[in-house]
């Protein structure tokens, strides 16, 4: 019956590997307390100039899920003083029905919901802010190198899969058009990346004031190496700069 089906849905373990409270570390809402829901699984396999994906446990080697819808509800009730949620990954749009359900649950607890996505697939949700982090060519994995988290050699298959999903401009456009607000938040390794950002803006029709350029890095020293020239570039070109508050504060740690 319907009651049994609903109970089974509430008890089902979902592909969510982390739920915790934190300050938003990036973008226009940086510094605001959030409830973070991390979805496991991603279509991309990012490897940047000096670092791999900062959440390899949700991408290169995705962990199994640990939480249910009831766990999400209970977390909201326990932390009712926080009214912002970010659903991140991994790639949340990989699990469309669950993403929609998480947004519906969040809205019942009066949450302002940010969906952080690489933009590989369009999903219509009740989210408020699409935080779009399109991956530039600086993220393409390099076959033959070692992925530290897994200890395995990066393969040509990893590269092909990454490139297949990296630039889904149609999905990105639909995500922007079908949600109340958005921000474009690309990872920048070098000044040469700016040309790709400008091309992406041209394709998507995104003005500079909606773009937040973010320095690449998993550790403080890596951010420090890029912060000065990237802030100067933002001033010169008219972009927003976003730091990475969680890395500045804690380094490469989980659950922060």
Residue ranges and their predicted role:
Residues 28:
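S-adenosyl-L-methionine
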Residues 93-256:
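Conserved AdoMet/S-adenosylmethionine-binding subsite of the radical SAM
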